[in-house]
Amino acid sequence: MNRVGFVGWRGMVGSVLMQRMQEEHDFKEFDSTFFSTSQTGNAAPFFSGSQSTLKDAHDIKELAAMNIILSCQGGDYTSDIYPKLRDSGWQGHWIDAASSLRMEKDAVIILDPLNSDLIQEAYKKGNKNWIGGNCTVSLMLLALDGLFKKDLIEWISSMTYQAASGAGAQNMRELISQMGNVYNHAKDLIDDPKASILDIDRNVSSTLKSQDFPIDNFGVPLAGSLIPWIDKDLNNGQSKEEWKGSAETNKILGRENNPIVIEGLCVRIGAMRCHSQALTIKLKKNISLEEINQTISSANQWVKLIPNEREISMKELSPAAVTGKLSIPIGRIRKLNMGPEYISAFTVGDQLLWGAAEPLRRILRILIKSI
């Protein structure tokens, strides 16, 4: 039976992955070994039904005993350990949530509902590096799967509304702390029916600008505000997160030599774990709205078409409605006044499920069946 090693399984993405693997009874398909960077020798989790101890995640010999390693430990760990492991002669499969290896020539960005053919072709050629994609990219691709498969898209402008979870667990905690801080400072005024809303607004504004406001992780207030920049500055006016939209999409689809133009701005908002995207799409030809909706809704089992109506859009197209779900709703689809080939759409997806853990879980199942 194949031996699979897990690193970073206690973190945010790793924890969601473990939960999904238990729900789908994945652990019965292989022998599991759990690694740790800080608690070597402690009891390992009981997910696989057998008791063991945690192995050292920096021990190349222990890692090399695995047929497959799945890491959610982050880019620094990958950059340190992966080359050492390959240099030791290890020929196993490396699955990774981090972005470090995504754009390497010998790496496949995994999203099997869209690129299963590319995955199978790479496997037959001996590829052994399988990397999870950027969260907003994966969610957008799944939502627009049908349009991509029929090669109907000329270009996309994507304006994102990204949750705190994309920045990490400590950022999620800080967002809640910021929310609590704002409320605590304004509570007396909120409870006073005679208090002016302008007084409450001034109180909130003052709190957000206070030197004591918790911003260690975000650097600026997110609660009651937003952050119009995500990831590194590429020194060309574009953030790295925005660059990923085009670069990773075209690699996932195998279109590096014939890329679809994808541009836009990435913005952090005060949601916890679901990313939203407002899309402007230019199609290659004028097709009916009915055909567009049918193409989108029938593409895969996770996309959920929401009628472009006020009440159901408000109910179904929000982070509050989608958190914890594998379904990816897409709505607000209509023809734009710019011309018959232009359409709008709005989509929401759980950043920790299809945006992170689920592609990793599924490629592991694919490899286990193939090896």
Can you describe what each PLM-predicted range is?
Residues 69, 164-371:
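Charged docking surfaces used in two-component/phosphorelay signaling
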Residues 1-217, 257-261, 328-329, 333-338, ...:
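N-terminal Rossmann-like NAD(P) cofactor-binding subdomain of oxidoreductases
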